[in-house]
Amino acid sequence: MASAFEMNRLAFIIFVYVIAAIPFGRCISACFGVDICTRGSGNIGATNMTRVMGLGFGSVVFMLDFLKAAAPVFLAVQCCSDVFASTVGFVAVFAHVFSVYMAFKGGKGVAPMMGVYFVLVLPVFIVAVCTWGIFFVLFRQPFISSLIACFIGAVYSYALLELYVFLPILAGTVLIFIRHTSNVREFLQAR
């Protein structure tokens, strides 16, 4: 029989999924009469919000998507192990990508992954943000910057974290790469 502690952790995981699955980009754009899913790339994330509605809206969506992972990971770090906190981070990324509120569709997962890095491994967050900035200046393609930043973040996480703490981060990174395959395909076809 499961202990009360294990049941509480399971309840917390479910709670994190329910909260992290909220598609903030879609909700905010709808408040202003815009269906973000039919504009720009059709994605609900910060990049498309910036493209369609401007930097202010994109920044708000980025922060909300960032916090949907950072806040529960912070709580998990305070009360449980880093392994559990990392698992909570993966659940937040997964919920963002496969939102129950959007028939299991969603964003690409980069903003919540940055939230995980910020709380769990701050040096990785700093390196990932700097990497994103450098490659955005070089290529002017947010998806290229995001993929390289997440890849570098995963490699650096592997160097800093214990294996069981790293594995959920690796799983989240793989998920982000899978969600960006259409971007890569379109980019290569345009060349």
Curated annotation (Swiss-Prot):
Its main location: membrane. The chain crosses the membrane at residues 10-30, 57-77, 84-104, 118-138, 158-178. It is an enzyme of class 2 (transferase). It catalyses: an acyl phosphate + sn-glycerol 3-phosphate = a 1-acyl-sn-glycero-3-phosphate + phosphate. It is a multi-pass membrane protein. Pathway: Lipid metabolism; phospholipid metabolism. One of its GO terms (molecular function) is acyl-phosphate glycerol-3-phosphate acyltransferase activity. GO terms for biological process: phospholipid biosynthetic process. Pfam families: G3P_acyltransf. InterPro entries: G3P_acylTferase_PlsY. Keywords: Cell inner membrane, Cell membrane, Lipid biosynthesis, Lipid metabolism, Membrane, Phospholipid biosynthesis, Phospholipid metabolism, Transferase, Transmembrane, Transmembrane helix. GO terms for cellular component: plasma membrane. It is found in: Cell inner membrane. Its EC number is 2.3.1.275. Catalyzes the transfer of an acyl group from acyl-phosphate (acyl-PO(4)) to glycerol-3-phosphate (G3P) to form lysophosphatidic acid (LPA). This enzyme utilizes acyl-phosphate as fatty acyl donor, but not acyl-CoA or acyl-ACP. Belongs to the PlsY family. Probably interacts with PlsX. This is Glycerol-3-phosphate acyltransferase.
